[in-house]
Amino acid sequence: MACSMISSATVAAVSRASPAQSSMVAPFTCLKSTSAFPVTQKTNNDITSIASNGGRVQCMQVWPPLGLKKFETLSYLPPLSSEQLAKEVDYLLRKNLIPCLEFELEHGFVYREHNRSPGYYDGRYWTMWKLPMFGCNDSSQVLKELEECKKAYPSAFIRIIGFDNKRQVQIISFIAYKPPGV
């Protein structure tokens, strides 16, 4: 590796020749040789310190491409119980999000209909169940509306949305109910 070095006499000559540039310092363009520093190499045969996951491949699974459709957030989990749904809604309320219910009669899974661009927004439009629950402060109110929506549309997919009314965006959505046989 080549290194450019400037002697102090050269820097002094440059500074005398151009008084406007007297504060300039020569650039540092190389590193010192590594042979000047003592090096201790430690051999590490521990598999957990290796960057790859080669030792853990047997326990990793991916989403099976056949037979299972991907739904919204948390779709990899088994259906949530009422208590688990209440905890999710409590989380939305703690984050000052407005809960809202939406339902879809035909396609609750991810597909492309109105938009061909990749990404989360795939062109699906769900129907809103009533209005967003702006005054809601308890998860039992949301679960009550969920039960009403189930009775009105037993074959529909129903999702709960957390809406941020300050930023005017949907923050979270997840499937709260899948029709029987799906």
UniProtKB/Swiss-Prot annotation:
Gene3D superfamilies reported for this sequence: Ribulose bisphosphate carboxylase, small subunit
The principal location of this protein is plastid
The molecular function terms of the Gene Ontology recorded here are: ribulose-bisphosphate carboxylase activity
Question: What GO terms fall under cellular component here?
Answer: chloroplast
GO biological process annotations for this chain's record?
A: photorespiration; reductive pentose-phosphate cycle
Compartments in which it is found: Plastid, Chloroplast
What SMART domains would the database entry show? RuBisCO_small
Q: Does the keyword Transcription apply?
A: no
From which residue to which does the transit peptide run? 1-58
Q: Which Cys-Cys disulfides exist here?
A: none
The lineage's top-level taxon is Eukaryota
| UniProt keywords, alphabetically | Calvin cycle, Carbon dioxide fixation, Chloroplast, Photorespiration, Photosynthesis, Plastid, Transit peptide
Q: How does it assemble?
A: Heterohexadecamer of 8 large and 8 small subunits.
Give the protein family: Belongs to the RuBisCO small chain family.
Q: What else is known?
A: The basic functional RuBisCO is composed of a large chain homodimer in a 'head-to-tail' conformation. In form I RuBisCO this homodimer is arranged in a barrel-like tetramer with the small subunits forming a tetrameric 'cap' on each end of the 'barrel'.
Function per UniProt: RuBisCO catalyzes two reactions: the carboxylation of D-ribulose 1,5-bisphosphate, the primary event in carbon dioxide fixation, as well as the oxidative fragmentation of the pentose substrate. Both reactions occur simultaneously and in competition at the same active site. Although the small subunit is not catalytic it is essential for maximal activity.
PANTHER family (alphabetical): RIBULOSE BISPHOSPHATE CARBOXYLASE SMALL CHAIN 1, CHLOROPLASTIC, RIBULOSE BISPHOSPHATE CARBOXYLASE SMALL SUBUNIT 1A, CHLOROPLASTIC-RELATED
* Protein's recorded name: Ribulose bisphosphate carboxylase small subunit, chloroplastic
Q: Which organism is it from?
A: Betula pendula
